[in-house]
């Protein structure tokens, strides 16, 4: 898709200028995750058919400057940093919607795609049809996980109870990982004085994505990242070489004011939660720390089913513009390189693509739609310890500067949930599923036993509900599959008399006559192990 974005933007410009020539007023052009968009001022909604007449190639002469397209004196706002390219001859309008950026303004948003060849378009539309079956926004609405609302603002998600269950499971798992690695969990405020961001450098380099405001003669900023606050905790007391490494973790909410045309469900939001971690350590501790981080990251990704060729590791080295001494960069890069070699994992070296403050290791994963996503990162930082004058007392009593490592395994918790929903098509591993068992009594006569089965499961901490509706059993089974419930338990007169259950699982698997106690024990084992592969069906089937 990345290779098409220049074409899409060119197509959007062409289509917008066609509209302008027809007397319409396009005001903004940009790119979404899978298409382009054009916002048009209009007192009434354009129809799909009306908009399609503007979807054709024309070689307009225009100028792009300062984020605007200028054509015959008319200026249209251009969002994003992609360069328009190519000569798209094939257009497709995907949908049209109306939104109100303010009380007195109505805009019609047209979304579409554009390609140079019909083959490109046909291939993409086929891919898009498949992708729509796995669109996390559609799955999230169907499963009642989360929602977005005009009243709350674009890019700001509201997680519903079942969505919060998924978040809690992922956070609990990461808490266990952090505890096993010696992290101390902290909490930091969402708002800080901008003096903090000026020291860190974010005020100059990241200000366009920050929310900054004045209050009581002070300038404040909502945090786009957690690291400066963790640094202040480190600085709150004298640190000895014996204390290092010091590891802080936080499930921190951060806010980055992305352009509205770039927002896309949970994949690109303005507020999200990071599984953030920062380690302060001596240079001689860097290699062992990174080795442990790489191992744990691969373990976590594997727990979600991403392993082998579906994980790609990148080592990014020193860019032309950087801070830190040659010796520091050489030591840090060698440490990261040695770790990857000693662990015998395949990796790709990306020359000069490291951060300006240090080398890094990134982990990409491939989902069921063959898309690659950058998730986890391990970044060495020489910059912030220098800016904040961090110190520790060395063995000889001298003061030394620690190295800092930034680490996130999920990256964005929200984005990770979106990827998992699309990868599993809503059928999450049992331990992550909001509802793990749904009990289906064959008739009202079996309702008492169904309630007893549910009570036994709930007492073991298994998320269970009953569907006692008067609909047919086949309809209730289908609804359970559609809702992504891993296990449907069917109980009738025979099951009640024998203290057994009939299990219906994903893949239309049915196992009859399973003792209730065994089902509960095996399911507890599957959930407790967070095992997406060795399910109870494989053990008792």
Curated annotation (Swiss-Prot):
Cofactor: Zn(2+)
Top EC class, one word: ligase
UniProt record similarity statement: Belongs to the class-II aminoacyl-tRNA synthetase family.
GO biological process: one example: threonyl-tRNA aminoacylation
Name of the protein this chain belongs to: Threonine--tRNA ligase catalytic subunit
Purpose of the protein: Catalyzes the attachment of threonine to tRNA(Thr) in a two-step reaction: L-threonine is first activated by ATP to form Thr-AMP and then transferred to the acceptor end of tRNA(Thr). Also activates L-serine and transfers it to tRNA(Thr) but cannot deacylate incorrectly charged amino acid; unlike most archaea the editing function is found in a freestanding protein.
Catalytic reactions of this protein: tRNA(Thr) + L-threonine + ATP = L-threonyl-tRNA(Thr) + AMP + diphosphate + H(+)
Cofactor note as given: Binds 1 zinc ion per subunit.
Entry annotated with the keyword Aminoacyl-tRNA synthetase: yes
Signal peptide: none
Keyword ATP-binding (UniProt): yes
